[in-house]
Regions:
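Acidic/histidine-rich helix-loop elements
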Residues: 5-28, 83-93, 117-127, 164, ...
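N-terminal active-site segment of His-dependent metallophosphoesterases
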Residues: 1-60
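Active-site neighborhood of phospho(di)ester-bond hydrolases with catalytic His/Asp-centered motifs
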Residues: 5-7, 43-49, 73-79, 113, ...
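Active-site-proximal segments of metal-dependent phosphoesterases and phosphodiesterases across multiple
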Residues: 17, 142-186
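Extended active-site neighborhood of metal-dependent phosphoesterases/phosphodiesterases
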Residues: 56-136, 141, 174-177, 181-184, ...
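Binuclear metal-dependent phosphoesterase catalytic core
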Residues: 23, 178, 196-279
């Protein structure tokens, strides 16, 4: 099974009065999303902040691009996706579920909603008690089958910057009380902090993707019989490289991070399933 995963995309509205901005926006995202969809996979996954403010026009624009190929696309909500509209309205437009799981032959896939609704002061993550108890049931039911979790916010004090204020699911929420019940291997994918990072703790591997605007790349996740292989694939087309500086200069609610790219150890890894089975 192969999964294609991308970090924060921040597809955004533009001001037509600013020369070249709309054209650069269209060229960047048409190229980037085209390369994302070009990759063959069983699921194509966004880790949230698919849009920059969650307006109806942003959602229509990005989903229009995503709909140009026949792919199974799953969108985990990010805080930026819920600024302009309420959660229910966003989900009505996208047709996505708030949180859910998919049980496959190779692994259990879990998609969380860690975003607060229209909270302009606190962009940190939150998981309510109902969702936490639901997740606990999914973890328990998965047994020793590998579990891959996809969420926007990291778990507190795991990947880089997850210890910062508003940089993770709130520290008062004991995610380990649920994740710690997992038998076998778990892999947790997230975005939000705009920096590449991989952290291993207990039987979990935490894989954090930087924003697509900063590091023009996706992750290829292959779930095999004996391991999970996570590889980075850069997008180096001119439509992306030449357009990005214009977006940095004009788009609101986003600050370019020139230090987003990590080393190889922050972007790629292999998670053994054999060792977990033997243990």
């Amino acid at each position: 099974m192969r999964l294609i995963v991308m970090g924060d995309l921040h597809y955004h509205d533009t001001d037509a009065a600013i020369a070249g901005w709309t054209e650069a926006r269209d060229r960047f995202y048409e190229t980037m999303i085209g390369k994302f969809l070009e990759e063959e996979g069983d699921f194509h996954i966004s880790l949230g902040d698919l849009t920059n403010y969650g307006t109806a026009t942003e959602l229509a624009g990005v989903y229009g691009l995503l709909g140009q190929a026949s792919r199974t696309f799953v969108h985990a909500l990010g805080n930026h996706d819920l600024y302009a509209q309420k959660r229910a309205d966003v989900l009505a437009i996208t047709g996505q579920k708030r949180y859910h799981s998919i049980d496959t032959e190779r692994a259990t896939l879990v998609f969380l909603d860690t975003a607060k609704e229209q909270d302009f002061e606190d962009w940190g993550g939150w998981v309510d008690e109902e969702q936490l108890r639901w997740l606990e049931g999914v973890v328990q039911a998965s047994g020793a089958k590998p579990m891959l979790v996809f969420a926007h916010h990291p778990v507190y004090r795991t990947t880089k910057r997850s210890e910062m204020d508003k940089g993770s699911i709130h520290h008062s929420i004991d995610m380990w009380s649920v994740l710690g019940q997992k038998q076998g291997v778990g892999v947790y994918f997230n975005g939000h902090t705009h920096v590449d990072s991989i952290h291993r703790e207990r039987n979990w591997t935490f894989v954090q993707l930087s924003a697509v605007l900063d590091q023009h790349a996706v992750r290829l996740v292959d779930v095999e019989s004996d391991c999970i292989r996570i590889a980075a694939k850069d997008v180096e087309e001119a439509g992306v490289l030449e357009s990005a500086p214009t977006l940095y200069a004009h788009m609101p609610h986003f600050r370019h991070n020139p230090e987003a790219r990590g080393g190889a150890e922050d972007r790629e890894c292999v998670v053994s399933l054999t060792a977990a089975t033997q243990a």
